[in-house]
């Protein structure tokens, strides 16, 4: 680019102005110079005379009111907004020419002139009696510096925005699809995923697609091969945590959020109205407080993988029996051995139940009620699970393995033995996994006491709705495990139905075992331990009266009294175990 001196630059500008003014047939604008260009500043002791093309002459000075700060204005330029367009400037061809003043960087500026690093021409404007100064378009040899000016303005704009929220460019974080590692378009079905995987999962859960993997259910799913195997793609969707109801809480519609606020306000008003009732110390929590606390229960916010991990960690330790190989079995010795083992397992069962997600959120009444209804079913499914690897035998403890012939020494025990062995064979045929087992055991705990008999003398559960929600959460976890194993949708439905049918069979075995244990108690064959006796009496109380053959009225009355006392004793044992656990944690 040709370099120009200051004098030649002014001459060149005069030539440009003359060329433009010739098209309008107007005389050329002349600027009288009294000193060199490098020494020309706007000073307080200087006045200038400018000859306008129309022939009018105006005198002005910096001390005159025409340059007061109230009348001086700067018209915004297009470059102030980072644009290279010159549409914001008035050309000499579009408006009558105005006097031009060249301002150069100097140590003493007039206080109302904007600083620039280079010479910038300004036009004087006369608008409704007030004068203003507007920056003109820079000539071609100033264009390289305009990029720097735009850059500095952008920096000032960004620095001003730092006081508020960050810009979209700084806050936007690149996320990738959890299934195929493509760029994620948003948070869909509980995970960050792309549009393709979101649409595929939506089609899969809405339709009845029985995908089959042509290989070994281990296909690689990435951006380029995600369409090669639908079965493995759906399996990976479940593995990364996709679920039907997985939506972000902050993405709910305005109507949903409005209804939520209205419900919370109504709950707060109800809480204030009943504040006097809440101050009274009661054994059971108020239903209003329980309802409010269950909204944000941690158990309902767990993912499938988190639920499985929590259930596996909650598993109780193995309990050894007091079996003596040198002592032969008879009815009394075997029943004593088994009841002692069951009594010690009950203590671990209570600790296990308190670690099941959502169980401790229930009232004390509901916790005791569920344990009293399900304790023998839980013991039996644990026995069946341990016996899977021992065909024809039952592993009651690591040091107590019994077969069918050994069970014949106890009257009525063979029938129960056969049902337990058949259930273990069914588990073995289905290849039941440990994760599925812990889910089934938790379902038994929460489901056994939900449907109480109308003839039951005890109060029903207080938080059935919340228990059903936790049950749904565990059932969804069970379905997630089946989908993760690579089963088709039809196979998942079939396996889930088979497992739930086995639970009804375990319930039948529990009823048979309860009747047998109660008969042993009535015959005084074996003394029952305290906790086991309480559980037995409480379970008899939960059963309908029609199930007993012909019990006498006095026996029923005594049983009711014993069971009521047993229930209170179990509550005290439960509370004492809690206090002991809290004391251990404190120590």
Curated annotation (Swiss-Prot):
The lineage of its organism: Eukaryota, Metazoa, Chordata, Craniata, Vertebrata. Residues 243-302 are annotated as: Hinge. SUPFAM superfamilies: Glucocorticoid receptor-like (DNA-binding domain) (SSF57716), Nuclear receptor ligand-binding domain (SSF48508). Disulfide bonds: none annotated. Residues 248-277 are annotated as: Disordered. Residues 303-587 are annotated as: Transactivation AF-2. InterPro entries: Est_rcpt/est-rel_rcp, Estr_rcpt, Estr_rcpt_N, NHR-like_dom_sf, Nucl_hrmn_rcpt_lig-bd, Nuclear_hormone_rcpt_NR3, Nuclear_hrmn_rcpt, Oestrogen-typ_rcpt_final_C_dom. A zinc finger (NR C4-type) spans 177-197, 213-237. This is Estrogen receptor.
């Amino acid at each position: 680019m040709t370099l120009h001196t200051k004098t030649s630059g002014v001459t060149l500008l005069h030539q440009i102005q003359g060329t433009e003014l010739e098209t309008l047939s107007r005389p050329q604008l002349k600027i009288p110079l009294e000193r060199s260009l490098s020494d020309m500043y706007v000073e307080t002791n200087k006045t200038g005379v400018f000859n306008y093309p129309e022939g009018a002459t105006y005198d002005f000075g910096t001390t005159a009111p025409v340059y007061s700060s109230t009348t001086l204005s700067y018209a915004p330029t297009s470059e102030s907004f980072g644009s290279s367009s010159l549409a914001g400037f008035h050309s000499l061809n579009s408006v009558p020419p105005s006097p031009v003043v060249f301002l150069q960087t100097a140590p003493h500026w007039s206080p109302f002139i904007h600083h620039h690093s280079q010479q910038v021409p300004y036009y004087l404007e006369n608008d409704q009696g007030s004068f203003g100064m507007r920056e003109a378009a820079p000539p071609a040899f100033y264009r390289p510096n305009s990029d720097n000016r735009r850059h500095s303005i952008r920096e000032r704009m960004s620095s001003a925005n730092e006081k508020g929220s960050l810009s979209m460019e700084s806050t936007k974080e690149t996320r990738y699809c959890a299934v195929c590692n493509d760029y994620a378009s948003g948070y869909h079905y509980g995970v960050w995923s792309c549009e393709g995987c979101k649409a595929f999962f939506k089609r899969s859960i809405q339709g009845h697609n029985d995908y089959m993997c042509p290989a070994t259910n281990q296909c690689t799913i990435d951006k380029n091969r995600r369409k090669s195997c639908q079965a493995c793609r759906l399996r990976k969707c479940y593995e990364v945590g996709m679920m039907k109801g997985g939506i972000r809480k902050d993405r709910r519609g305005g109507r949903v959020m409005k209804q939520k606020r209205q419900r919370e306000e109504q709950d707060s008003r109800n809480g204030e109205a009943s504040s006097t009732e809440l101050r009274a110390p009661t054994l059971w929590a108020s239903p209003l407080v329980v309802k409010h606390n269950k909204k944000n229960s941690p158990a309902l916010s767990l993912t499938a993988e988190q639920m499985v991990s929590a259930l596996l960690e909650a598993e109780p330790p193995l309990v050894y029996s007091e079996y003596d190989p040198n002592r032969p079995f008879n009815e009394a010795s075997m029943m004593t051995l088994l009841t002692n083992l069951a009594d010690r397992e009950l203590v671990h069962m209570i600790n296990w139940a308190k670690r099941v997600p959502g169980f401790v959120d229930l009232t004390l009444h509901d916790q005791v009620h569920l344990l009293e209804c399900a304790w023998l079913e839980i013991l039996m499914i644990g026995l069946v699970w341990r016996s899977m690897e021992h065909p024809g035998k039952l592993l009651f403890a690591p040091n107590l393995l019994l077969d069918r012939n050994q069970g014949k020494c106890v009257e009525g025990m063979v029938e129960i033995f056969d049902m337990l062995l058949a259930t273990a064979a069914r588990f073995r045929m289905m290849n039941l996994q440990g994760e599925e087992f812990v889910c089934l055991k938790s379902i038994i705990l929460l489901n056994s006491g939900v449907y109480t008999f109308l003839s039951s003398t005890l109060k029903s559960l207080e938080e059935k709705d919340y228990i059903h929600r936790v049950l749904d959460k565990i059932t969804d976890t069970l379905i997630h495990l089946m989908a993760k194993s690579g089963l088709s949708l039809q196979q998942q439905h079939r396996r889930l139905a088979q497992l739930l049918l086995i639970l009804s069979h375990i319930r039948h075995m529990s009823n048979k075992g309860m009747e047998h244990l109660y008969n042993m108690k009535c015959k005084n064959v074996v003394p029952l331990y305290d906790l086991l006796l309480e559980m037995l009496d409480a379970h008899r109380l939960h059963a309908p009266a029609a199930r007993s053959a012909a019990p006498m009225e006095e026996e029923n009355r005594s049983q009711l009294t014993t069971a009521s006392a047993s229930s209170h004793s179990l509550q005290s044992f439960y509370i004492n175990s809690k206090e002991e656990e809290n004391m251990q944690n404190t120590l």
